[in-house]
Amino acid sequence: MSTRRVWKQSEIKTNPLFSKMRSTIETAFYGNNVTPVTSVAQAYQLAAEEPGVIVLDMPVYKPCEQGLPADAKVLVTNDGKTTGRYAKARRIIGDEGIDEVELANIARDAVYDSRNKEWIAAQTIVGLDKKFTARAHLMIPKDHASILYSWIMNFKFFDAAVKEFYDDSLEIPEGDIYIYSDPDYIVPGHPGGLAIFDPAHNCAMILGMRYFGEHKKGTLTLAWSLANRLGYVACHGGMKRYNLDNGKSYTIGVFGLSGSGKSTLTHEKHDGRYDISILHDDAYIINTEDLSSIALEPTYFDKMQDYPVEHPANEFLLTLQNVGVTMDEDGRKVVLAEDVRNSNGRAIKSQFWTDNRVNYVDEPVNAIVWLMKDKTLPPILKIDDPVLASTMGATLATRRSTAEKLDAHVDPNALVIEPYANPFRTYPLALDYESYKKLFSECGVECYIMNTGFFLDNKVPKEVTLDLLERLVEGTLEFKPFYKYPNLEYVEVPGFEPPFQVREYHHQLHKAFEFRYDYVEKLIGHKNELPEEVLEVLKTLM
């Protein structure tokens, strides 16, 4: 499915796809101060010439195959104090309490006040299969060309080959995605930045925010919203397919915030014991009718905390954000990673990082795993009831990650709920709830919880999680009832046995489910209110 950029004149007057915000943003793209970027190589050159950008002595792997100059190098940009996404800056038009007229006024002023700047713009696609693909546009001041370059490499540049693919995709009655970004424009009263989203009209304006993740996830926010309207489930997680013997396969999706292990589990090769196909480690969609899955982006926006300079994965770097640089023994500028400079150092790695990559999985997904960091839960639980399975996704309990910018009063270690591990939802939560429940109730998808944090006082090591994952795929896990808690089963793991005989443990479980109950109860009467059955099923566990 492809979105639309042009219209017959007879379609324009009463077109519901236009709005105050969309018309303000799209109009800005046509100014005589905006220069279109027409190739990946041009974007690279502009980024390399941006003041402050560091050109490392680390070559890009297979540059020509990615549209880059043959001598292209890895580029570094550093943002300053902010090195993570700032959710508090988001304003969603259509949400209660949001004044569209006020935000439209801010948007028009932002465009006018920045008219003397030189701007650049580019196009990409989001969605890598002909069944779902949307064209996206980004404009940004030339002084921030590195953001545009990273954005182009994160998604897929709209070149001649992509145009042919796009033109052959099914057209849908939705407009292209438009994003206007001015990282230097500070709106009075919004010192941390302001990100205005009009998801119903596929557009956004990002003001005063330099972090690349705002632009990546801002684009995905609009694409996920669009996909939801077309009958897809938005997925912030990883998906891989195990291609087993006798023509069998096992497809699994893991959902979690940054730092939950979703990328690690997705890319794990299990010492070569399995033939594996990877869809993506962060962003995809599932069709609720045929259960096929589509990746939204070709590359990977990965943390650098576990990748010292000599790590083989660094061969596939394209750009780096918020990392250090030093000199090696041969006098070459190389990355100083592992979060020495600051937390949440990041990289865009090319699609060549995975030699087993696919953009579309037509086999039905077999299992969905909620990755949590809830110390009351054992390393793995199986959920046997569709209502409870979707409820536990809607009340996914975890810890905040370094990918987020938090205000000073926020405890980064506090247990929080992030429904379906997706903080980028713009539509009512109940839509996701019903979609996931349908997967579990009508489509035969199994549901599990994996605790990748602490169980009571013991850290669940990666090796334990991987062993459970392998046995899950092979069908050799032996589940037993989780005490008297209905529709929950667990696996006995040495060193992580639930102390059912200890009263305090049941009290902690009660508090954990009560925490979820209270969260859902507070949603009543608001945009994200969930069906009554969610509260009812949580009561059975309390």
Regions found by a protein language model. Give the residues of each.
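N-terminal accessory targeting/assembly segments
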Residues: 2-161
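Glycine-rich, often acidic-flanked micro-motifs
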Residues: 2-72, 236-257, 267-268, 273-275, ...
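Gly-rich Lys/Arg/Thr-decorated short loops/hinges at beta-loop-alpha junctions or inter-strand turns
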Residues: 85-91, 198-203, 413-419
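Short histidine-centered catalytic/ligand-binding loop motif
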Residues: 92-99, 205-211, 423
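Pre-ATPase regulatory/linker segments immediately N-terminal to the P-loop/RecA-like helicase/translocase core
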Residues: 137-187, 198-199
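Charged, amphipathic alpha-helical linker segments immediately N-terminal to NTP-binding catalytic cores
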Residues: 176-177, 181-230, 234
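Conserved lysine of the Walker
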Residues: 262
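C-terminal non-catalytic accessory extensions
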Residues: 522-542
